[in-house]
UniProtKB/Swiss-Prot annotation:
Keyword Transport appears in the UniProt entry: yes
Topology Extracellular: residue spans: 161-174, 243-287, 333-372, 434-448, 527-529, 580-585
Subcellular location: Membrane
Disordered: annotated segments: 1-28
Gene Ontology CC terms, in alphabetical order: membrane
Similarity annotation: Belongs to the SLC12A transporter family.
Keyword annotations of the record: Glycoprotein, Ion transport, Membrane, Potassium, Potassium transport, Symport, Transmembrane, Transmembrane helix, Transport
Protein purpose: Probable cation/chloride cotransporter.
Main location, first listed in the record: membrane
Protein name according to UniProt: Cation-chloride cotransporter 2
InterPro entries: AA-permease/SLC12A_dom (IPR004841), SLC12_C (IPR018491), SLC12A_fam (IPR004842)
Residues annotated as transmembrane: 140-160, 175-195, 222-242, 288-308, 312-332, 373-393, 413-433, 449-469, 506-526, 530-552, 559-579, 586-606
Gene Ontology MF term list: chloride:monoatomic cation symporter activity
Gene: CCC2
């Protein structure tokens, strides 16, 4: 018998097991760039401690080449044991090389990073290796999170569209709008803070958080949508800056501006005045200047984080100054030469603007009864929401932050609260400042009211939008590079970036998307698309926090304590509701795009286990289901076969084949429509400490083989002194509760007599007895080499030789075979064995009634024992019907028994086999041989053309020779090409009742 019978790990019993050296403990390789690495001088045997102390530590210079291969580890270990170099260490018992210090913590972190299931739990190992990490300036909370968030939030919408929103929706609905969107971003910020403070965070921002919480498929799909949202948002900001510039400097236009004449501007349902002329920049001017500005911003982004950090204050300070100038102008209005619409802060104006005035507008946003666009609250929601979508700007740069767990919550929350308060205050101020006509027709009302000059606001608008565009063009490439570095989608490999380097290829791709959207040139067409992508990302962050908070796994310990799963759930629902309120069409399109990416990642993506929340949910669901099943017996209606597939207990297969190729096909035949679980087990003979690594390697190989054969199951490899002992451990301990395997499946040992493997009978009988004792059913397959696959359709009959009560297992197996394409054209025949002829008709009627009640269609044939006495029909000319077969079996058994008796007499001990005392009853041996011979002849007579034969397995007689039992089984199965020998257990698996 092979050692373990498992590919690559087995050997023949004739070979003496080679003694292996004791495994040496391995330690982390000391890197040459580790600073302050101390090499303790080895203390020679017999030397004093003082001498060792005088020698002192030797400091290794960085860059010294250190050999750390296995031979060096073995030598160092031997040196410790022989020379006692660590003999005086207080922690020698724990097996550490040196005392616990900060270097030990570095090793712990390094080992966790290497042991992660993904190639990069945030970093791509294949990229980082061989490329020294560049020194990168780390950012604090102010410059790394607060400033980017503020720049993204205070964008074009506030300056150009916010006064118009107040005029269209009225003061009270504008307050509801701002509070509604602010609640969504606030709850998302709470969820973001909780997840970001639950451990170290790598590059990728929200993608990293969602991917590690909801899995790589969801993370990549939402991450790519969020990347597109950032790239398109950059185009929106660029267009806003260009539009403002052309309004402020009309002489810079290359093409003639578009002029819109509105005959009657309707305000509060009445015409407000005469014809109004509205001038808007030409589309081609927007395209030309937009492309130029995008290219200039890309040059800044190519300069890296250092240049961006230097440029960012230059963009933000004028923005804050311009907002201050707007507030000053509001409080001192109206000034001389002010517009006729500006009334100054007035309660009367506030009352007039309190209610909404939704109406039709033209493409320029001017009220027009013949306009093509009708506005309502939902439409305003889609227009305004991009003004609050900058809360992820700081987390997008998580790889560049000094302390992500402190900076992201504080910076993002302060930016969210401050801007929301500013928006709420602005609603009151603008509503009390100007008439509704001015709010709806003057797009740059903020500039008109600003002190001391509109030029301040023009500069603020341009710089704010350029700053927001710069942040978008900075965060989007890093997000795409983080997705590519995770190595989930091979198609994104072009966008990978080395650790510490700039994602130049991703920046070029982002610029291409941004320029493509700039060419569209319509700001109101771009904003709904951005809104959907950002809301999808926010919903993903909230769902991630909801799942992690609800499951409350031991690893869920966020430093940010102000969170609850109900808040995250409300935030996620708010995001979904806002998406459908804005536009169900855009919502369906965005969800369809995310679903397509999810499907593509699941098909083409590389598998990665990031410990996501779904795995924890599956685990807790499995525990709940297991507890709900209890320890009671499973009702026959709920009984599922859980086969324990015993791989390669005997038989020689190629070393690279972990189990018989057809075992997986047979396991699939035992499950209806793939429902159920199979457990593939194998045993490696030997000592556990010596063969543990071999078992792990074999288990991985077997798992891969199961997946290759498309069989739903798990693999288990154990190490035991022998196959019998190993199987006994498996049959007692495998499984949990009612999810324990209930059927043991193995091949019939057809080679035992051919190769004279005399130890197989004892193992075979031991396995069957263990199954009977453990109340497990047994299915032994002969003819596995000829078992059909799913493409080989069979025609004929499935014959059952029902001899003993087995709980209906044989009947159920035959019905399961019929559910497979290979056997669906077959018919079932049930052969019942009767003792007397008088019982035949009664037995046939009972079996037919029983099968009818079981909803099973089968032909019933009764065979009596007396018919065995007649000479068999020899028309087939089979050699099995010749008495020579019977005499050969008798001769082999007599020879074997005589050898056992001679050994017992020679050693003066009782008759023993396999270490157990046995009793030889030659009359029973003759009787059992004859029974098997006649049963085999009956099977050949009636089922010679059967596709599969199922027959009851006789239990091994107590204190009987295993060799004799093996001879009985050989007589039973000989010349039958494909047979299943089935032993049921003391439990019904079929029921008559509904």
């Amino acid at each position: 018998m092979e050692r373990g019978g498992f590919g690559g790990a087995g050997r023949h019993d004739e070979e003496a097991p080679a003694m292996r050296p004791a495994p040496q403990q391995r330690y982390r390789t000391v890197e040459s760039h580790d600073r302050a690495v101390v090499q303790m001088a080895p203390m020679e045997f017999g030397s004093s401690a003082d001498a060792s102390a005088s020698a002192g530590p030797r400091y290794i210079k960085p860059g010294t080449n250190l050999r750390t291969d296995a031979r060096m580890h073995m030598a160092s270990s031997n040196g410790r044991s022989s020379n006692g170099s660590q003999g005086d260490s207080k922690l020698e018992l724990f097996g550490f090389d040196s005392l616990v210090n900060i270097l030990g913590l570095k090793r712990m972190v390094g080992e966790q990073a290497q042991a992660s299931a993904s190639t990069r739990d945030g970093e791509n190992a294949g990229i980082a290796i061989g490329h020294p990490k560049e020194t990168e300036t780390k950012l604090d909370t102010m410059m790394g999170v607060f400033v980017p968030c503020l720049q993204n939030i205070l964008g074009i919408i506030y300056y150009i569209r916010f006064t118009w929103i107040v005029g269209m929706g009225g003061v009270w609905q504008s307050l509801v709008l701002v509070a509604f969107c602010g609640s969504c971003t606030f709850l998302t910020t709470i969820s973001l803070s909780a997840i970001a403070t639950n451990g170290a965070m790598k590059g990728g921002g929200p993608y990293y958080l969602i991917g590690r919480a909801l899995g790589p498929e969801v993370g990549v799909s939402i991450g790519l949508c969020f990347f597109l949202g950032n790239a398109v948002a950059g185009a929106m900001y660029v267009l806003g800056a260009v539009e403002t510039f052309l309004d402020a400097v009309p002489s810079a236009e290359f093409f003639q501006e578009s002029v819109t004449v509105v005959t009657n501007t309707f305000v509060n349902g009445t015409a407000a005045g005469n014809a109004t002329t509205i001038s808007t920049p030409n589309l081609h001017d927007l395209q030309v200047y937009g492309i130029i500005v995008t290219i200039l911003l890309c040059f800044i982004v190519f300069g890296g984080v250092k240049i961006i950090n230097k440029v960012a204050p230059a963009f933000l300070i004028p923005v804050l100054f311009s907002i201050l100038c707007i507030y000053i102008g509001v409080f001192i209005a109206p000034r001389p030469n002010a517009s006729k619409w500006i009334t100054g802060l007035s309660i009367t104006t506030l009352k007039d603007n309190w209610s909404s005035d939704y109406q039709r507008t033209n493409n320029a946003g001017v009220p027009d009864p013949n306009g093509s666009i009708y506005w309502d609250f939902n439409a305003l929601l889609g227009l305004y929401f991009p003004a609050v979508t900058g809360i992820m700007a700081g987390s997008n740069r998580s790889a560049s932050l000094k302390d992500t767990q402190r900076s992201i919550p504080i910076g993002t929350l302060h930016a969210t609260i401050s801007t929301t308060m500013m928006y709420l205050l602005s609603v009151f101020l603008f509503g009390a400042l100007s008439t509704r006509e001015g709010l709806l027709t003057d797009r740059l009302l903020c500039a008109a009211v600003a002190w001391p000059s509109p030029a301040v606001v023009y500069a603020g608008i341009i710089l704010s939008t350029l700053g927001a565009a710069l942040q978008s063009l900075t965060g989007a490439p890093r997000l795409l590079a983080a997705i590519a570095n995770d190595d989930i989608l091979p198609v994104l490999n072009y966008f990978k970036a080395y650790e510490g380097s700039e994602p130049h290829v991703a920046t070029l791709f982002t610029s291409f998307i941004c320029i493509s959207c700039v060419i569209i040139g319509n700001l109101d067409v771009i904003t709904p698309t951005i809104t959907m992508f950002f809301l999808l990302c926010y919903a993903g962050v909230n769902l991630s926090c909801f799942l992690l908070d609800l499951l409350d796994a031991p690893s869920w310990r966020p430093r940010w304590k102000l969170h609850h799963w109900s808040l995250s759930l409300i935030g996620a629902l708010l995001c979904i509701v806002i998406m459908f309120m804005i536009s169900w069409t855009f919502t369906v399109v965005s969800l369809a795009l995310a679903s397509l990416i999810y499907y593509y990642v699941s098909l083409k993506g590389k598998a990665g286990d990031w410990g996501d929340g779904f795995k924890s949910a599956y685990f807790q669901l499995a525990l709940r289901s297991l507890r709900s099943m209890g320890a009671n017996q499973v009702h026959p209606k709920n009984w599922y076969p859980i086969p324990l597939i015993f791989c390669r207990p005997w038989g020689k297969l190629p070393e690279d084949v972990p189990c018989h190729p057809k075992l997986a096909d047979f396991a699939n035949c035992m499950k209806k429509k793939g429902r159920g679980m199979s457990i593939f087990v194998s045993i490696i003979d030997g000592d556990y400490h010596e063969s543990a690594e071999d078992a792990k390697t074999a288990c991985r190989q077997l798992s891969a083989y199961i997946d290759y054969r498309r069989c739903e199951g798990v693999a288990e490899i154990i190490v035991a002194p022998s196959t019998s002992i190993g199987f006994r451990s498996i049959v007692q301990t495998m499984g949990l509760g009612n999810l324990k395997p209930n059927i043991v499946v193995m091949r019939y040992p057809e080679i035992w007599r051919r190769e004279n493997l005399t130890q197989i009978p004892s193992t075979f009988v031991s396995i069957i007895n263990d199954c009977i004792t453990a109340n497990k059913a047994v299915v032994i397959v002969k003819g596995l080499d000829e078992w059909p696959n799913e493409y080989q359709r069979q025609y004929g009959t499935i014959d059952l030789y029902w001899i003993v009560r087995d709980g209906g297992l044989m009947l159920l197996l035959s019905q399961l075979l019929l559910t497979k394409e290979s056997f669906e054209s077959c018919k079932i025949q049930v052969f019942c064995i009767a003792e007397e002829d008088t019982e035949a008709e009664e037995l046939k009627a009972d079996v037919k009634k029983f099968l009818y009640d079981l909803r099973m269609q089968a032909d019933v044939i009764v065979v009596t024992v007396k018919s065995w006495e007649a000479d068999p029909d020899r028309s087939g000319g089979s050699k099995k019907d010749d008495p020579e077969v019977y005499r050969s079996a008798q001769s082999r058994i007599r020879t074997y028994i005589s050898q056992l008796k001679e050994a017992a007499e020679r050693e003066r001990r009782p008759l023993m086999e396999g270490g157990k005392q046995v009793v030889v009853d030659e009359q029973k041996v003759e009787k059992f041989l004859y029974t098997m011979l006649k049963l085999n002849a009956t099977i050949l007579r009636h089922s010679r053309m059967a596709v599969v034969v199922l027959v009851s397995l006789p239990p091994p007689p107590l204190n009987h020779l295993a060799y004799c039992y093996m001879e009985y089984m050989d007589l039973l199965v000989e010349n039958i090409p494909r047979i299943l020998i089935v032993r049921g257990y003391r439990r019904d698996v079929v029921t008559l009742f509904t």
